[in-house]
């Protein structure tokens, strides 16, 4: 009897174990689990976090980065920010129909946003910024009636902004800045109330939100349906051809009339395009070696127009200001900040104006007007390093590149170690390294990030403006240190050596940025391939030293990065003939 009872117990135990295993297997392959595994299988690389997702696990709710509803056990949040994810977004994500929060920003995801994401009707927040996502914004996102936050900034999106997004009545935050979007910004619903900050960095957008008028041909056409229904319709082509004939006659008449008006009124139209400095404007000069009266400077300011623009950036428009005695200055216009901020702004400018160093662009003074601040800097005829590397026809030889790197390092090191108070730049990039007539580098725009950090618009611009140069921890926390500058400097060195932008298209195709590309080449023992093929006179020993320094600077761990003082020491001892006294040269050329 005991033996029979034991056999029955064993049979029941085996049956219960089998049913339990079957239940666990069914849980592991739930629709939500399958969707997440499809995402995992499509990712080509990561820091290992999603490698812990196992199909045999009984519950995907225990997976890293996954949050489930306590009662329904459905996935409600997927948060995998800054985990070095490289790969496409699979359409299976659309099966997570209870998903409320999708946070995949600060990775290396690419290809397009799946239209199936529009099936996740419970979504309240989509954060895909700082990736390499291409294609158009799916119009299906307009179906997400509960969506509150949508951030697609710092990607490679193209096409028009779908008008369907204007239907999102609960949307409070929207950011598509720094992409390649084109056409007219829809003026439906919330989209009509958004400011310029949501769209910065898309050169071919137009609309009242960014104060750019759309023309009838081109931009407004690009803002049509993103589904591409325009096509080469024969009737449209016929109408277009007929309209062109009449249009040419109209253009000829307009040109004739325009020339007549220009002779009469043209010069009046270009006056005071920069700013009306009358009525309470004052000039503050920091260095006593400028022999100009305030009225002379103000007179020159009033004559500036769009023909004098030499650059535009996240901090403002830059104009070329020529004085009667032949001296030339660069004038940076910063729009008036919030009321009550003037005193702090002026105090900080006094600090910046006291800094003089061979490898920094001198701030000579500023004009305080009722509507804006106009900062007066030394003008450097060599333009920016960005222009020299990527936009001009001439090629920088090896010696010029090395000297530029060393000069930029010395300027940044001076800000970190010899200024009181110390200055963290936060926006080191090639367009902020200016060159004089001898191609000697000077760091510009230092201190401006701190001046404007309390402005919401600036925070958006600074992060967007330096995308590709930003240290990982800065993108994650928003907290800048000297080591975030060191990382950006390391990226700058790689840019100078390679002649490629940090987010060059050749990297994006492989899911890299310039740092990822370097790491890949190092793993393949091909680091030398990073050098620009057009660069002449490359010295192998100097190249090895520069690659070693750059690799240290772009370490993912801030603690492993050298200080800029140490970087200068390495450059002087391993790349050039040591001349340490030059580092502390605070004289201005």
Swiss-Prot record:
GO process terms (BP): mucilage biosynthetic process; mucilage biosynthetic process involved in seed coat development; plant-type cell wall organization; unidimensional cell growth
Keywords: ATP-binding, Cell membrane, Glycoprotein, Kinase, Leucine-rich repeat, Membrane, Nucleotide-binding, Phosphoprotein, Receptor, Repeat, Serine/threonine-protein kinase, Signal, Transferase, Transmembrane, Transmembrane helix
Modified residues (Phosphothreonine): 460-461, 466
Reaction(s) the record says it catalyses: L-seryl-[protein] + ATP = O-phospho-L-seryl-[protein] + ADP + H(+); L-threonyl-[protein] + ATP = O-phospho-L-threonyl-[protein] + ADP + H(+)
InterPro entries per the UniProt record, alphabetical: Kinase-like_dom_sf (IPR011009), Leu-rich_rpt (IPR001611), Leu-rich_rpt_typical-subtyp (IPR003591), LRR_dom_sf (IPR032675), LRR_N_plant-typ (IPR013210), Prot_kinase_dom (IPR000719), Protein_kinase_ATP_BS (IPR017441), Ser/Thr_kinase_AS (IPR008271)
Modification after translation: Autophosphorylated.
EC number per UniProt: 2.7.11.1
Transmembrane segments: 237-257
GO terms for cellular component: plasma membrane
First-listed, main subcellular location of the protein, grouped into a coarse class: membrane
LRR repeats: 72-96, 97-120, 122-144, 145-168, 170-193
Location of the active site: 427 (proton acceptor)
Annotated GO MF terms: ATP binding; kinase activity; protein serine kinase activity; protein serine/threonine kinase activity
Keyword Nuclease part of the UniProt annotation: no
Protein name in UniProt: LRR receptor-like serine/threonine-protein kinase FEI 2
Organism: Arabidopsis thaliana (Mouse-ear cress)
């Amino acid at each position: 009897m005991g033996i029979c009872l034991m056999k029955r117990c064993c049979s029941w135990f085996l049956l219960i174990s089998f049913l339990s295993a079957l239940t666990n297997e069914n849980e592991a392959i739930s629709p939500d689990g399958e969707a997440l595994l499809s995402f995992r299988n499509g990712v080509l690389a990561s820091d290992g976090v999603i490698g812990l997702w196992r199909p045999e696990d009984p519950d995907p709710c225990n997976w890293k980065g996954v949050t489930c509803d306590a009662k329904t056990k459905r996935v409600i949040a997927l948060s995998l920010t800054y985990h070095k994810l490289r790969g496409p977004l699979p359409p299976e994500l659309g099966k997570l129909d209870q998903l409320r929060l999708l946070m995949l920003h600060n990775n290396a995801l690419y290809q397009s946003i799946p239209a199936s994401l529009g099936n996740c009707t419970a979504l309240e927040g989509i954060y895909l910024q700082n990736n390499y996502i291409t294609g158009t914004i799916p119009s299906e996102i307009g179906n997400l009636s509960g969506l509150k936050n949508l951030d697609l900034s710092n990607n490679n999106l193209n096409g028009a902004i779908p008008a369907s997004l204007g239907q999102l009545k609960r949307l409070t935050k929207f950011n598509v800045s720094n992409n390649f979007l084109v056409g007219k910004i829809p003026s439906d619903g919330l989209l009509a109330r958004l400011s310029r900050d949501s769209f910065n960095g898309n050169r071919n957008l137009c609309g009242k939100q960014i104060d750019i008028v759309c023309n009838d041909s081109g931009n407004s056409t690009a803002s049509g349906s993103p589904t591409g229904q325009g096509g080469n319709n024969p009737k449209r082509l016929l109408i277009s051809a007929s309209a062109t004939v009449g249009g040419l006659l109209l253009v000829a008449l307009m040109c004739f009339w325009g020339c007549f008006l220009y002779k009469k009124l043209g010069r009046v139209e270009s006056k005071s395009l920069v700013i009306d400095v009358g009525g309470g404007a004052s000039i503050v000069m920091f260095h006593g070696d400028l022999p100009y009266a305030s009225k002379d400077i103000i007179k020159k300011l009033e004559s500036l127009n769009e023909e004098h623009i030499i650059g535009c950036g996240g901090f403002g428009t830059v104009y070329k200001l020529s004085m009667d005695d032949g001296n030339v200055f660069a004038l940076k216009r910063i729009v008036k900040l919030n009321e009550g901020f003037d005193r702090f702004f002026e105090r900080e400018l006094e600090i910046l104006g006291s800094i003089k160093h061979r490898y920094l662009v001198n701030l000579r003074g500023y004009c305080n007007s009722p509507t804006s601040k106009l900062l007066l800097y030394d003008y450097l005829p060599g333009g920016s390093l960005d222009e020299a590397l990527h936009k001009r026809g001439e090629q920088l030889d090896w010696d010029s590149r090395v000297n530029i790197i060393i000069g930029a390092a010395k300027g940044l090191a001076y800000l970190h170690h010899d200024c009181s108070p110390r200055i963290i730049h936060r926006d080191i990039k090639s367009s902020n390294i200016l060159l004089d007539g001898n191609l000697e580098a000077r760091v510009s725009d230092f201190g401006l990030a701190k001046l404007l950090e309390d402005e919401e618009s600036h925070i958006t611009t600074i992060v967007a403006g330096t995308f590709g140069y930003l240290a990982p921890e800065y993108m994650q926390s928003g907290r800048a240190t000297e080591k975030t500058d060191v990382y950006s400097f390391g990226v700058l060195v790689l840019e100078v050596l390679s002649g490629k932008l940090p987010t060059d298209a050749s990297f994006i195709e492989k899911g890299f940025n310039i740092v990822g590309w370097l790491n890949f080449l190092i793993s393949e023992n091909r680091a030398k391939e990073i050098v620009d093929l057009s660069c002449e006179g490359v010295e192998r020993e100097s190249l090895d030293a520069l690659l070693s320094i750059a690799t240290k600077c772009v370490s993912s761990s801030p603690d492993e990065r050298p200080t800029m003082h140490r970087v200068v020491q390495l450059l002087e001892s391993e790349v050039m003939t040591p001349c340490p006294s030059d580092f502390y040269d605070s004289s201005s050329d």
